[in-house]
A protein has these predicted regions:
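Transmembrane beta-barrel domains of Gram-negative outer membranes and organellar outer membranes
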Residues: 19-263
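Bacterial N-terminal signal peptides
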Residues: 4-15
């Protein structure tokens, strides 16, 4: 984890010689569009502080590739699996580590959209957690929708999902997970951007006092070329103004995204 933080600082502040390619600013905007027709592989490192009954640090790595599939000259199908790898404190010196539940978001989106891009499709959550404490033990299905507006230096929009349990492990309660992720990016020269993309979540079947997670915050991102490989890096921080009892008080996130634009 220390190595990841050092890489974040060194790459974000690295030598200007790797940023001279003329397409860096265009790639920056593409990296900010969750349904861009470009293969990308983000690695999202989340350092969560104040978790559990003893207010300890937890960590989760979200591996969330984006795979666009061309259906016709007018339509794309965007596939976005999200695989979490978790390490969480349980209190009393105990911890659990392993895979969490896999989320699959998919979107049908027009391929010829310009300044406004939208997409809708099905989403699913699979009970892939390797430990009981790392998942909900439910199979969830529901809709997903996204809208993106791009104008000048701005890339902004929101991604919304809603799931409902359709099956699950005996003895575990059903879930109805909802999430909305608004995102605002203001792009600066040389691939820099000011960014915020908090994810607000709720489970409509949870106790009302433990339903919502509401983070606020933001940070910076930079898109660059290392050799011929486009990368996007982001360093952001969020504070949870409302949250379930044992969720983190605040989070520091370092994201590294490998981009593979069509040639």
């Amino acid at each position: 984890m220390k190595t990841a933080a050092l890489l974040a600082v060194s790459w974000l502040c690295g030598a200007a010689t790797v940023y001279s390619e003329t397409d860096v600013e265009a790639l920056a905007k593409k990296s900010q569009n969750p349904v861009e027709a470009m293969v990308s592989v983000p690695f999202q490192n989340n350092f969560n502080f104040g978790m559990g009954p003893d207010k300890e640090m937890g960590y989760n790595l979200n591996i969330q590739p984006v795979v666009p599939l061309s259906l016709s000259s007018n339509w794309n199908y965007i596939v976005r699996p999200i695989l979490p790898i978790l390490d969480i404190p349980l209190g009393g010196g105990r911890r659990k580590s392993g895979l969490g539940d896999l989320t699959l978001e998919t979107f049908f989106t027009p391929s010829n959209a310009k300044s406004f891009i939208w997409g809708v499709g099905p989403m699913a959550i699979f009970p892939t957690a390797t430990e009981r404490e790392l998942g909900n033990g439910q199979w969830d299905l529901g809709p997903a929708a996204v809208g993106v507006y791009m104008h000048g230096p701005w890339v902004l929009g929101a991604l919304v999902t809603q799931g409902w349990s359709v099956a699950g492990e005996s003895g575990r309660p059903g879930t109805a997970p909802f999430s909305v992720q608004p995102f605002i990016n203001y792009n600066l020269p040389h691939g820099w951007a000011i960014t915020t993309a908090p994810t607000y979540t709720a489970d409509w079947r949870s106790d009302a006092n433990d339903a919502w997670t509401l983070p606020v915050g933001g940070g910076i991102s930079r898109t660059l070329l290392v050799g011929k490989q486009p990368l996007s890096l982001a360093l952001v921080a969020y504070y949870n103004v409302d949250k379930p009892r044992y969720q983190a008080d605040y989070q520091i996130r370092f994201s590294l995204t490998f981009m593979f634009p069509a040639k």
